[in-house]
Amino acid sequence: MNIQFNFNQKTGRIKPMHGVGQPPFLGIDYSYFSYLKEAAVPFARLHDVGGAYGGGRFVDIPNIFRDFNADETDPASYDFAFTDTLVSALMDYGCPPIFRLGVTIENQCYIRAYHIHPPKDFGKWARICEHIIRHYNEGWANGFHFGIVYWEIWNEPDNGLPGENQMWTGTDEEYFALYDVTAKHLKKCFGSSIKVGGFASSGFYSIFNEPLKFGVPEKASSNELSEEMREYAKSPRAKHMLTFFFAFFDYMKQHGSPIDFFSWHSYDSVAEVEQIADFVDRCLCDFGFGHLETQLNEWNNAPKKELRGTSFASANAAAMMCAMQNKKTDILCYYDARIGQSVYGGLFNPITYKPFCTYYAFAAFGELYRLGSQAGVSGAQQGVYALAAADAGKHAALIANISEKDAVLSTNLSPAMKGFLLDQEHFLTETDQNPASFVLKQNQVILLKNF
């Protein structure tokens, strides 16, 4: 396979494809945020950061505004203590939050749901959100002037049929109304100084059940995870997610609800996510919302305990970021960067607290992100993803091989470029491979740069 790079051709900016969710911290030890800074991670989405049932301390509305009957205009009604430490640390390390206004998932809600009910007064809930924003952006209640841009209204209200949803016990229509009331109030208060959006869609897996109807391939890839997702796509839960999506934007149009960005989630493979991104963009254009920013702000294409810290995980993460750079999607946030025993926590070893190889896929992308301008690439195919960036005389390229075999590659890269290999045995280890001709093994990544 011959891959050609043109560092004189500028095709746009390198987008923030290497954001994360659940930033890495232990207790209130935020020193692990240094890893985010080293990788130039651009955003940390604040959802599920509070621990089980919100943990009682961080971010969630019930953790900040503990008594819903209290006066929402009184600073004494708010408990910003722990959330202040978290948000301040993120800002200190140069990683602003995407602030989710809502609650943490309640995984065992079938026993009892605590905070995932619709607020009993949507207008008051919107005013509570207003004062949280004023605290972090306007200094209200001994607050800050952080200029946080992205404010997301709730998370995955579509995640399950009524009675089964771990995020939202209300009806679809109740969420639409909550979004409408809150978005209108926040935009009235803050105008263009903030961006308001949602609804953090749980996913679009079911479109592959009717490929002709939705304009997608019957099967974009065939790895084990994609096969599992195809089975999941047949479930009533997955079908409800799609119905919710169409109904949400129909409501937005009918009610003139303001929305600056649409957020969605996926745990599918790279090839499927590429197709989903195109589907989302087509739908938004059809709805009359083609101008919206879009965020894939919860994704993980190796969410299994046996895949954490493997070459498969790091290569697929790098491939996802390279692939989505070439889609319309504006921001990606990987789920997640926590330090803990979770199948989703793919960046850090929960025993040693050290980075897994997958973290270095984000660090490698960060090298291109710092350069700023995307450069021309041609010739990558068949499960090999390539991306390039340039800044004046500085050049860098990233290649990920997630195909079913080793890739024999030739390029027009100068032999003077240094190569750094990434897999579960090499954490961006410098290699003596000739950049003009080399073999990139299955599930390997290489970063090449001249600086």
Q: Language-model segments: which ranges?
A:
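Glycoside hydrolase catalytic-domain groove-lining segments
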Residues: 253-307, 330
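Substrate-binding cleft and catalytic face of glycoside hydrolase catalytic domains
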Residues: 39-259, 265, 269
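Short, acidic/polar
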Residues: 24-36, 238-254, 312-321
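C-terminal beta-strand-rich structural cap/linker in extracellular carbohydrate-active enzymes
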Residues: 431-451
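Carbohydrate-binding surface patches
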Residues: 380-415, 422-425, 443-444
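Mature N-terminal, pre-catalytic/accessory segment of carbohydrate-active enzymes
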Residues: 1-35, 39
